[in-house]
Regions:
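N-terminal pre-catalytic "stem/leader" segment of glycosyltransferase-like enzymes
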Residues: 1-61, 167, 314-318
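Short loop/turn segments at strand-loop or loop-helix junctions that form parts
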Residues: 8-15, 60-63, 96-100, 155-167, ...
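Short, charged/polar "capping" segments at the starts of alpha-helices
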Residues: 16-24, 53, 66-67, 71, ...
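Well-ordered, non-membrane alpha-helical segments in soluble/globular domains
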Residues: 23-32, 71-81, 174-185
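Extended catalytic core of nucleotide-activated donor transferases of GT-like folds
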Residues: 39-107
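Leloir-type glycosyltransferase catalytic cores
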Residues: 108-155, 267-318
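Catalytic donor nucleotide-activated moiety binding site of glycosyltransferases and closely related
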Residues: 182-223
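A donor-sugar binding/catalytic signature common to diverse glycosyltransferases
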Residues: 224-270
């Protein structure tokens, strides 16, 4: 052990909505506690809606959303309570979040999820991946039957991937104003066809923005179309900071982001200057993909304690 005493770990089941599909998120919290206990720490699952003293409080997701309809929800309040209390005590909260690689297999049979301390952006979270090994990436290559595709040598259209209009990940940037600025910047430097990909989890909001998109004179990818279809014959992908900034380079397509690189999972290798849309940088990706895989863990990794044995090295308590 790297600390003088066993750590106290709490997995907060009430960080989940009351009605959820399936048991994956419940299992994620439960297995995390099981794995930590196997490493010799005092770890347990709690159904409490009030704070329980701990060195590490595990939750699903985060509580960064400013949407008034969400901040009143009980599970959101539990998440915020854990995050705020741990922060005030200079302790740790652990986020169990979405899998960047899930586009490879939506069923996610090995239940890979992303684990980090104290934040979900690379800039704010501790991903425990500064010096990544090869084991996680090798496991994911095997389990997803995948590898890094060679950088593309040709392409036609530019794919712009939109984020949720009111999503916290936009970090306060208005989506339609962002799109207008981004389209203008691209058009200053390229006359390639532009395809817009709406956020797949937010099609209910699409009708509210459809007329604006029509005015921009762009083509919108159909609902339920897989991102790999939109990447066929693609020249480059553009987004603010979201998951496609990582998906595109895995598939051999250069990505451009408009946010600070440290707020994007693809930031280490992404382009940031849209004036270079016709001449994108395509760097070596090996270290980047190892870092990305290092913060993804399967249920087998989590339940066995392999995940916690690794992450525990970043927990410093007195």
């Amino acid at each position: 052990m790297h600390n003088a005493r066993p750590l106290i770990i709490k997995s907060y089941l009430r960080s989940l909505p009351r009605h959820i599909n399936g048991n994956e998120k419940i299992d994620a919290l439960t297995y995390f506690a099981e794995g930590a206990a196997k490493c010799g720490d005092s770890a347990s699952v709690t159904n409490s809606q009030t704070y329980e003293t701990c060195d590490v409080g595990a939750i699903i997701g985060n509580a960064f959303d400013a949407n008034p309809s969400k901040v009143r929800l009980p599970h959101y309040q539990v998440r915020k309570m854990v995050m705020d209390t741990q922060h005030s005590l200079h302790r740790y909260w652990l986020s169990i979040d979405s899998n960047v690689f899930i586009y490879k297999n939506a069923a996610n049979p090995h239940k890979y999820l992303r684990y980090s301390f104290n934040g979900v952006f690379p800039a704010t979270g501790i991903y425990c991946n500064e010096t990544p090994g090869t084991e996680n990436w090798n496991n994911m290559r095997r389990d997803y039957n995948m590898d890094l595709k060679p950088w593309r040598s040709s392409g036609n259209h530019i794919l712009i991937c939109l984020q949720r209009p009111l999503g916290w990940s936009m970090r306060g940037v208005d989506l339609m104003k962002w799109l207008k600025r981004t389209l203008s910047r691209i058009r200053e430097n390229s006359d390639r066809p532009i395809l817009i990909r709406w956020h797949p989890g937010d099609w209910k909001a699409f009708p509210n923005y459809k007329s604006t998109l029509v005015k921009f004179g762009v083509t919108v990818s159909p609902q339920n179309r897989h991102i790999t279809e939109d990447l066929v014959n693609c020249w480059a992908v553009v987004c603010h900071n979201s998951t496609p900034s990582a998906v595109a380079p895995i598939e051999g397509i250069p990505a451009f982001i408009t946010d600070e690189p440290a707020y994007s999972q693809g930031g280490d290798i992404a382009n940031t200057d849209l004036s270079q849309i016709e001449n994108p940088h395509m760097p070596d990706r090996e270290q980047w993909i190892r870092k990305l895989a290092q913060c993804h863990w399967s249920f087998e990794d989590v339940r066995s304690g392999r995940c916690w044995s690794h992450m525990r090295n970043w927990v410093k308590v007195s």
